Amino acid sequence: MARPDTVIPDKPESPYPIVQDSVVVSGFGRGSSELGIPTANIPINDDLNQLETGIYYGWCQLKPCTLPDECKTRTNGREVIYNHGKNLRNDDLKVLPMVMSIGWNPFYHLKEKAAEVHIMHKFDDFFYGAQIKFNVLGYIRPELDYTTKEALIEDINLDIKIALEALDRDAYQTYKDL
C-alpha cells in the first residue's frame, strides 16, 4: 500500500481530543538503536485499542515517580532499569509534541499490538516507569509495511514534519495545556 495523502484539519475533529494517562514501559529496543527515533512505549488500553491502527499526533508530558529503581527484562532478554523518570530535567518535563504509532508494525512482524510514542525532544537518559499524560489530536495515516528500514525512517520523519506543522497551528496550540 502506498502512503496516502495526508490532510490535517484546521482544528481537531471528533473523536479528538482523546486524553490519556499512562506509564512508560520498555519496548523492543529498536526505536533508538535501529532507527535513531526513540519511542516511549505505553500499554494498550481499551481506548487506544479501539483506534484504527496508524500514526497519530498530539501533545504529551512526562512526570517522574518516586518509586525505587528496578531492573526488568525485555522480551528480547535484555535488562533495562526502570528509574521512573527521576533523571528527567526541567526541559524534559515541559509539554512536548509527539507522534504515536498504534498497531502491529508490519515491518517488524509484531505478534501483539503496540503503542509507541515518539516525543519530539532530545532526552539525556531513559525514563522507563515515568508517568506520561498525552492527548491525541488527529490521525496522519494508516500503518504501512516497508521493504527497507530506510523507507520506514523516511516515512517516520515525514510524520514528524506533518505533526509539527499541525501542532504549530493556533487551534492545536490550545490543547497544549494538559
From Swiss-Prot:
Entry annotation: catalytic residues: E116 (nucleophile)
Enzyme class: transferase
Binding-site residues for Mg(2+), renumbered to this chain: T39, N41
EC number: 2.7.1.26
Cofactor note: Zinc or magnesium.
Residue ranges crossing the lipid bilayer per the database entry: none
GO cellular component terms, semicolon-separated: mitochondrion
Catalytic activity: riboflavin + ATP = FMN + ADP + H(+)
GO biological process entries: FMN biosynthetic process; riboflavin biosynthetic process
Gene Ontology molecular function, alphabetical: ATP binding; metal ion binding; riboflavin kinase activity
Designated name of the protein: Riboflavin kinase
Organism: Scheffersomyces stipitis (strain ATCC 58785 / CBS 6054 / NBRC 10063 / NRRL Y-11545) (Yeast)
